[in-house]
Amino acid sequence: MEIKVLEKGFIRLVEVMGDDFSAVQAARVSYGKGLTTPERDKKLIFYLMEHGHHSPFEHIIFKFHIKLPIFVMRQLVRHRIASINERSGRYTEFSDEWYIPERIRTPDKVNRQGSVFVDDDDLNSEGIRLIEETIEKTYQAYKRLLEMGVARELARIVLPTSMYTECYWTINARSMMNFLNLRADSHAQYEMQQYALAVAKIFKSKCPVTYEAFLNFAYTGDLLKTEGCL
């Protein structure tokens, strides 16, 4: 399952270990029991979520392959309860792929952590032109340094954080729900929100009961409760 994100990025599910009822099995092992009926298992998942017993959900593991701008990657790695391997800029050359926003945003006067899109055509045109020109110049400087024989690990320091990188990201469902609370929310940066929504879509498709319970009892953000968000 692969979802396109932004204009050149994606998030792809590589593999998943477990499903909704892996949490049920983990919870019931305390009593020497396993699965019962689908109805009772669903009730248990809802009970666990409602009462904050989230450790059984750590037994559901997702592995993703993600292509994303470096500045989004830097936010992703702040979620420490996950395993990450990123493409190396020391051993591989960066291709000419970078993120350009479709529209300019300005600081939100109400939500100080957020930003809002502007309808000013002149600002959009001039802002995007300046972003594109600056990135192109830095990438050409990077290529020139490589041509001069400068090591990749040093030449890359001129590159902007809009460059695309790739990583493998492995995370359990409990940590994923924490990620969604923080990133599938209007306080998060717009570009980060788009990746969080893609993660939520995959989570919902693979663990629909857990996802439903999460939204009902544990989700503290706002985007996932917006109709049509996925």
Swiss-Prot record:
Q: Needs which cofactor?
A: FAD
Q: Which residues form the active site?
A: 183
Classification via Pfam families: Thy1
Could you tell me which pathway this protein works in? Pyrimidine metabolism; dTTP biosynthesis
Give the enzyme class.
transferase
Output the GO biological process annotations, alphabetical, semicolon-separated: dTMP biosynthetic process; dTTP biosynthetic process; methylation
Q: Which residues bind FAD?
A: 55, 78-80, 86, 172-174, 178
GO molecular function per UniProt = flavin adenine dinucleotide binding; NADPH binding; thymidylate synthase (FAD) activity; thymidylate synthase activity
The UniProt record gives the binding positions of dUMP as 75-78, 86-90, 156, 183
UniProt cross-references to InterPro entries, sorted A to Z: Thymidylate_synthase_ThyX, Thymidylate_synthase_ThyX_sf
EC number(s) from the headed UniProt entry: 2.1.1.148
Instruction: Please give the function described in this protein's UniProt entry.
Output: Catalyzes the reductive methylation of 2'-deoxyuridine-5'-monophosphate (dUMP) to 2'-deoxythymidine-5'-monophosphate (dTMP) while utilizing 5,10-methylenetetrahydrofolate (mTHF) as the methyl donor, and NADPH and FADH(2) as the reductant.
Q: What is this protein called?
A: Flavin-dependent thymidylate synthase
Species annotation: Kosmotoga olearia (strain ATCC BAA-1733 / DSM 21960 / TBF 19.5.1)
